[in-house]
Curated annotation (Swiss-Prot):
<dbReference type="GO" id="GO:0047498">
    <property type="term" value="F:calcium-dependent phospholipase A2 activity"/>
</dbReference>
<dbReference type="GO" id="GO:0005509">
    <property type="term" value="F:calcium ion binding"/>
</dbReference>
<feature type="disulfide bond">
    <location>
        <begin position="56"/>
        <end position="80"/>
    </location>
</feature>
<comment type="function">
    <text>Snake venom phospholipase A2 homolog that lacks enzymatic activity. Shows high myotoxin activities and displays edema-inducing activities. Has cytotoxic activities against HUVEC cells (LC(50)=4.9 uL) and human lung adenocarcinoma A549 cells (LC(50)=3.5 uL).</text>
</comment>
<feature type="region of interest" description="Important for membrane-damaging activities in eukaryotes and bacteria; heparin-binding">
    <location>
        <begin position="104"/>
        <end position="116"/>
    </location>
</feature>
<dbReference type="GO" id="GO:0016042">
    <property type="term" value="P:lipid catabolic process"/>
</dbReference>
<protein>
    <recommendedName>
        <fullName>Phospholipase A2 homolog ECO_00035</fullName>
    </recommendedName>
</protein>
<feature type="disulfide bond">
    <location>
        <begin position="25"/>
        <end position="114"/>
    </location>
</feature>
<dbReference type="GO" id="GO:0090729">
    <property type="term" value="F:toxin activity"/>
</dbReference>
<keyword id="KW-0964">Secreted</keyword>
<feature type="disulfide bond">
    <location>
        <begin position="27"/>
        <end position="43"/>
    </location>
</feature>
<dbReference type="InterPro" id="IPR033112">
    <property type="entry name" value="PLipase_A2_Asp_AS"/>
</dbReference>
<keyword id="KW-0800">Toxin</keyword>
<dbReference type="InterPro" id="IPR001211">
    <property type="entry name" value="PLipase_A2"/>
</dbReference>
<keyword id="KW-0959">Myotoxin</keyword>
<comment type="similarity">
    <text>Belongs to the phospholipase A2 family. Group II subfamily. S49 sub-subfamily.</text>
</comment>
<feature type="disulfide bond">
    <location>
        <begin position="74"/>
        <end position="85"/>
    </location>
</feature>
Amino acid sequence: SVIELGKMIVQLTNKTPASYVSYGCFCGGGDRGKPKDATDRCCFVHSCCYDTLPDCSPKTDQYKYKWENGEIICENSTSCKKRICECDKAVAICLRENLKTYNKKYKIYPNILCRGEPDKC
């Protein structure tokens, strides 16, 4: 769920989840146009990951994970929860790897400015 995702973001980036709400064209919803930078592309890929889970509820299904030696370990009994956790883990890692591309001008970015054909997942 968004709760676990938020915790992962804090643990891996030391940024608050609010830093990514309405960031660019894909972080925190919107999902249109082209990603603005590598950080926004992380969210695009995350959205694509969620698209592969049509029978799951990634925003509301809570799951369990461990934080061990600076690493996220997904531990769930159900397939849906494990896959949601893996999607969230991947975006948190991606955001950490692309912290240098984070640009404040894309925070609370107007969705109307997100134009162009979206990339394919």
